[in-house]
Amino acid sequence: MAIFFVSCPLHFENHLAEEIKSFWFEMMDLDGQPTRQPVPEFEIVPGGIEIKCADHLGYQINFFSKLALRVLIRIHRFTARFYDQFEKEMKALPLDKWIDDKNVAVKIETAKSRLNHERNLIEAATKALSGSGFKLMSKANNKIYIRIVKDNATISLDTSGEHLHKRGYSIFKGDAPIRENLAALMVQQIYHHNKDRHISFIDPFVGSGTTLFETASFFTPNFNRDYAWLQFKNKPKVFNSESWVKNFRWVQNPKNVELTGIDIDQEAIDNLNENSLLFAKTYPEISLQLKTLVADSTELKKEQLASTNKPCWVISNPPYGVRLSQSSVHQAFRHLESLVDLAGAVILHPETLAIDFSDLRLSSQIDFSNQGLKLKLSVFTK
C-alpha cells in the first residue's frame, strides 16, 4: 500500500472525490481484471485528496481523472526544524526504488515552519541528493515535491509528468481558453442531471473546442500521452507489455458523439478543426459527429443546426467583458433556445454576468474563483 496525493484546483476537492469513486472499479488489478479492491477512504484537504491504496491503482488515477492536476506518491515524512536534520532525512530518500534517471527537479513549499528559506533548502537538498548520485536540474523528467508545514516535511514523487489537464489535443488556442479540467467539471454537472450518456451537445461560443472535446472524452481514460510513472523501475509488470491498453476491454467508449460548435471567429473554428485531428489521435476509441459553423449565434437559423433524436445540452464558457457585451450573451442563449428543444444547459460565467433562459430553470450553481475572477458554474434544466 502507498499514500497518494491527487491535486486539483481549490474548491474542486469534493467533485474530485466523487469522480474518483465513479471510475474506481474501471481501474485494473494486477491480474488484468477490473479491480475488486474497495474504494478507500479519502482525506480531503485544500487543493486535493490524500488516498491510501495499492500502488497500481494510485498510478492509474492519472489515466482516468479529468479533474485532477497531478498525482503524487508520498515517499517520506519526517520532522524538520534544523537544516542538518533536513539534509540527513533527504539522504535517506529511497529514490532508487522508483527511478534510474539521476536528473531530478525539486519543488519546495513551506508554511509556518522554522525552515522557510527556499534557497537554503535547495542547497541542502542538492548536497544530500548528490551523495546518491542525483543532480538537481531546473527541468527534469522526474520531480520531487517537498512540503514543510509546521516543521513537518512531506516528500513526494510526481507520477504524472505534465499537468493532467494537458490531454494532448488542445494545441491550437485562441484568447483566454478554458482549461480542460474546468470544462470537465462542467461536464460532470451535466451527468448529475442527465444519467443517460446518449446526449448531443452544442456550444454557441465554442472557441477552440475544449468544452465539446471534454464532453466527448469524459468517460474515456487517456492512455495516449506520457506519464512519469510509466518510466518507474517498480511499475507493475502488467504495464510492461506494449499491448497493456488492450487489457481495459471493459471500458465502454462513446460512439457517434454528436457535437455542434459555433463561433463568429473563423480562426477559432480553424483551431477547433485542427484540434479535432489531434483529438482523434489522443482518443482513437471515440467516434465524433462534429459539426462546426462560423456564425453569429444571435442570428442562427434552424436549418443550420443538425437534427438529433438525443437530448440536447448547451455547454458554454461565453466570452465576456470587452470581447462580447452582456446583452449579446443573453440574446444568443435565448435565441438558441428558440431553435432547439433543450434538455438543459451548463454555463461558466462571471458572477456579474446574469444568465437565464425562457423554459429552463436554474437547478444548481457552483461558486469559485479562477485567477482572481469570481465565477459561477450554473446548471439549467427543465
What are these regions (language model features)?
Residues 155-191:
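SAM-dependent Rossmann-like transferase core, predominantly class I methyltransferases
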Residues 178-298:
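Conserved S-adenosyl-L-methionine
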Residues 2-140:
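Non-catalytic nucleic-acid substrate-recognition regions in nucleic-acid-modifying enzymes
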Residues 8, 263, 349:
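Short beta-strand/turn micro-motifs composed of small residues
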Residues 295-382:
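C-terminal catalytic and target-recognition region of SAM-dependent MTase-like enzymes
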Residues 129-140, 144-167, 206:
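Catalytic cores of enzyme domains
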Residues 12, 265, 351:
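Residues in the short beta-alpha loop(s) of Rossmann-like NAD(P)-binding domains
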